[in-house]
Amino acid sequence: MKPPQRGRGGGVRGGRGLARGGEGSAVRGSGRGGESGRGRGPGRVKSESDGGIKGGSKVLVTPHRHAGVFVAKSKADALVTKNLVPGEIIYNEKRIFVQNEDRSTVEYRVWNPHRSKLADAITTGVDNIWIKPGVKVLYLGASSGYTVSHVSDIVGPEGCVYAVEHSDICGKVLMNMAEKRTNVIPIIEDARHPAKYRMLVGMVDIIFSDVNHPEQANILSLNASYFLKSGGHFMISIKANSIDSTIAAETVYQMEVEKLQMEELRPTEILHLDSCEEKHACVFGGYRLPRK
């Protein structure tokens, strides 16, 4: 059985594969704008560092349609987030400094879609990431915090990222990063056992699950039962070979979708990602959504 795609498969629809931001929807399959997003007029600014764009060149930084995400446009476009802690870098990432008309400076960090599944999903054309300023996120499989740091930028000082990582080595890097980013709460625990960290995590708006484990769907559903608000949302990264390398990736995706549906996790969109890894997909959806 093939995994659900646009226009079939119980309402789960595939992305349209656009690398641009804009108003176009990954579900609707129609483009209604460019990278500048909805309605907010960008200002032309000047770059003061390379940041993926040649230093000193004129750069146009515009809001992406996903709140808290931006696009720096020049000879080479780059996905960026506004640095929550100006002056601090996480992984020697490139930065772009732009000067506003009032002479204030804003610092942006370049977000590489080849290193982050969430960034890859955005450039592929996901309809909604549900992560936006002010929300609370539970991130399972935080690793050393590359994507977590950009999620931290997006949710801002009013939001919060609970970052769960099992590896002590990655956990140390994650904790060092969180010293400056006060909206990141590192939790060095096994995501398979949420009862161990239930006293540290409040109810969240979205769970982002990037746990490379054969039981990853069950891990997500168990954490959702503890922490995800009814009507909240989720994203799960599925690496087919980690679940069953003996069958077709499409079959694996369908099996995982069916597991999620059994646990009140309703998938609404599936994207095949190529930038990070082969045979990899991300499923987005909602939890205990009201029936239409």
Curated annotation (Swiss-Prot):
Q: Might you report a single GO cellular component term? A: nucleolus
Q: Which InterPro entries match?
A: Fibrillarin, SAM-dependent_MTases_sf
Annotated localization: Nucleus, Nucleolus
Compositionally biased residues, Gly residues: 7-42
The alphabetized UniProt keywords are:
Methyltransferase, Nucleus, Ribonucleoprotein, RNA-binding, rRNA processing, S-adenosyl-L-methionine, Transferase
Report where it is expressed, by tissue. Not detectable by RT-PCR.
Q: Name one GO biological process term.
A: rRNA processing
Main localization is nucleus
Region entry Disordered, spans: 1-58
Quote one Gene Ontology molecular function term.
RNA binding
Query: Which Pfam families does the entry mention?
Result: Fibrillarin (PF01269)
Its biological purpose: S-adenosyl-L-methionine-dependent methyltransferase that has the ability to methylate both RNAs and proteins. Involved in pre-rRNA processing. Utilizes the methyl donor S-adenosyl-L-methionine to catalyze the site-specific 2'-hydroxyl methylation of ribose moieties in pre-ribosomal RNA. Site specificity is provided by a guide RNA that base pairs with the substrate. Methylation occurs at a characteristic distance from the sequence involved in base pairing with the guide RNA.
This protein is called what? Putative rRNA 2'-O-methyltransferase fibrillarin 3
Which source organism? Answer: Arabidopsis thaliana (Mouse-ear cress)
